[in-house]
């Protein structure tokens, strides 16, 4: 999958669509300027969206995909994990019993499971958007201000394990260019 992702960059000039990973550069795309890559946009003018010919019918631009709620729940889960680790480290240093440690783990794991279930409900709510083309905020290393064409694509993560329609078309254009 990494090879295919990197192939997308090298062969078709595709941008990274992820935004939550730590990268060595910030503000890679200047605000207010439309990126050149075919698969991300600053959405300066929704009426001239660069992939408008591929938009799915009935999809709002920008496309609500539960981003804020997903991010908030994911952050809560990370916080609970961090709190659990700190608590368990503290208990171990204090010489707590295995039973006490086990009970604390059980309590934190239940909190995590509850938050994951909440997150899963949000994911399910927006599942109808899978495979659709819209303008999904969060792309090009930026959580806000840049948009990608689909909820998931090989340029965003390895979950979808395929390129979205916009990226497929960009690759197709390059194949046609090099074979003519």
Where would I find each of the regions flagged by the language model?
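Active-site recognition of the HExxH zinc-binding catalytic motif
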Residues: 1-17
């Amino acid at each position: 999958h990494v090879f295919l992702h990197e192939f997308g960059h090298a062969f078709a000039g595709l941008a990274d669509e992820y935004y939550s990973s730590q990268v060595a550069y910030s503000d890679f795309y200047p605000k207010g300027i439309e990126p050149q890559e075919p698969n991300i946009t600053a959405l300066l003018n929704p009426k001239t969206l660069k992939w408008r010919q591929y938009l799915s019918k009935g999809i709002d631009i920008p496309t609500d995909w539960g981003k804020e709620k997903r991010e908030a729940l994911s952050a809560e889960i990370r916080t609970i994990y961090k709190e659990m680790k700190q608590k368990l480290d503290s208990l171990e240093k204090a010489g707590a019993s295995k039973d006490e440690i086990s009970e604390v783990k059980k309590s934190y794991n239940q909190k995590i499971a509850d938050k994951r279930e909440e997150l899963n409900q949000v994911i399910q709510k927006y599942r109808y958007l899978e495979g659709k083309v819209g303008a999904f905020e969060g792309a090009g290393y930026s959580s806000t201000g840049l948009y990608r064409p689909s909820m998931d694509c090989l340029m965003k993560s390895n979950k979808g394990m395929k390129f979205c329609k916009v990226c497929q078309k960009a690759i197709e254009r390059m194949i046609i260019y090099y074979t003519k």
